[in-house]
Regions:
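Walker A/P-loop
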Residues: 36-56
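Residue-level preference for the first positions of well-ordered beta-strands
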Residues: 38-40, 68-70, 125-127
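Conserved helix-turn-beta segment of the N-terminal RecA-like "Helicase ATP-binding" lobe
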Residues: 77-110
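Conserved helicase ATPase core of P-loop NTP-dependent helicases/translocases
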Residues: 113-117
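Conserved two-lobed SF2 helicase motor
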Residues: 121-132
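Conserved pre-motif I regulatory segment
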Residues: 2-42
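Conserved Walker A/P-loop ATP-binding site and its immediately adjacent core
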Residues: 51-54, 61, 65-89, 131-132
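Conserved catalytic network of the ASCE P-loop NTPase/AAA+ motor domain
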Residues: 62-64, 119-123
Length: 132
């Protein structure tokens, strides 16, 4: 059967190259706006949006005086992409290391999400992942 529609992209590999902090081009552009109160990142699937959020959230926690980060995702399966991630090995100043107890998107996580959320707010932990 012939292809009726064929789409090709100019694949240069540029989007997969990383800088000295381990960021792809799109992540670097997002990180440049890290001090913004609101930030919308629009990019294709699997382009590194979750990791871009990790970079920005860690900067807000370490350098901007923010005490807690709540990552609210539209569905539980997306929450899995926010598991612990070694970012230091690629040059970033910190690793993404949320406490498993406060990733409310993983199987077997806290039965009462409200209780877990309230516990997080009163704890010293700085990262919570949940659905919105």
């Amino acid at each position: 059967m012939p292809d009726f529609i064929k789409v090709t992209y100019n694949q240069t590999g540029k989007s997969k190259k990383t800088n000295e902090l381990g960021m792809r081009e799109m992540q670097e552009r997002a990180f440049a706006a890290k001090t913004a109160q609101y930030l919308l990142i629009k990019a294709p699937p699997a382009s590194g949006k979750s990791r871009a959020l990790m970079f920005i959230a860690l900067d807000k926690l370490k350098n901007q005086g923010i005490k807690k980060v709540i990552v609210a995702v539209p569905e539980k399966s997306i929450g899995a992409s926010f598991d612990a991630t070694n970012l230091k090995q690629y040059g970033f100043f910190a690793d993404w290391a949320p406490a498993p107890k406060y990733n409310l998107c993983t199987p077997g996580s806290e039965k009462s999400k409200v209780s877990a959320f309230l516990s997080f707010l009163e704890s010293d932990e700085s990262i919570l992942i949940c659905t919105h």
